[in-house]
Design a protein with these regions (language model features):
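Sec-dependent N-terminal signal peptides
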Residues: 4-13
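Beta-strand-enriched cores of mature, soluble protein domains
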Residues: 18-148
Length: 148
């Protein structure tokens, strides 16, 4: 009986406690254009493309698009979707988002919202996001993601 109980507990711990981690690193060039209004609020479209690699050895190209907003009180928003296509033509789409609290630091959050079959285990993975921009709109970014 004790052996059965230990076997069941071991199975439950492995099944429910198993989480993985993957790290993505990317570089690219961003293009941000839009409007700044008289009250200093703004609405801008964000587009970028570049290259990525993962801690599992995959690599490929990415394209991103979304919005960068600021209201008249200085509250900022960043909501961008990036499609990452691998060397094997598999893909995953990551939503990257930030609010005012993290706007200046380049830190934020991300979540994987869609994926092809080979990346389907990553759907729902939550990630920390960090990006550094150079003066020329080139950037370096990293996401550290946890998944089950």
């Amino acid at each position: 009986m004790i052996k059965k109980l230990l076997l069941i507990l071991t199975f439950l711990m492995v099944s429910y406690g198993k989480t993985g981690e993957i790290i993505f690193e990317g570089t690219g060039k961003a293009d941000i254009n839009g409007y700044t209004f008289n009250d200093n609020s703004s609405y801008k479209l964000y587009r970028s493309n570049g290259h990525w690699k993962s801690s599992t050895g995959d690599f490929g190209l990415h394209t991103c698009m979304g919005t960068v907003t600021s209201d008249k009180n200085g509250k900022n928003g960043f909501n961008v979707y990036c499609k990452n296509t691998s060397q094997k033509d598999d893909y995953f789409i990551m939503k990257i988002y930030r609010d005012s609290e993290y706007q200046e630091s380049g830190a934020g959050r991300a979540i994987i919202v869609e994926a092809s079959k080979n990346y389907s285990h990553l759907i729902g993975a939550e990630c920390s996001h960090a990006v550094t921009y150079l003066k020329s709109s080139d950037y370096f970014a990293m996401q550290k993601c946890k998944f089950r």
